[in-house]
Amino acid sequence: GGPYAFGL
């Protein structure tokens, strides 16, 4: 959910 390349 964050602006990074992760599914967080």
Curated annotation (Swiss-Prot):
GO terms for cellular component: extracellular region. It is found in: Secreted. Coiled coil: none annotated. Disulfide bonds: none annotated. GO terms for biological process: neuropeptide signaling pathway. Keywords: Amidation, Neuropeptide, Secreted. The keyword Secreted applies. Its main location: secreted. The modification Leucine amide is found at L8. May act as a neurotransmitter or neuromodulator. Belongs to the allatostatin family. This is Carcinustatin-9.
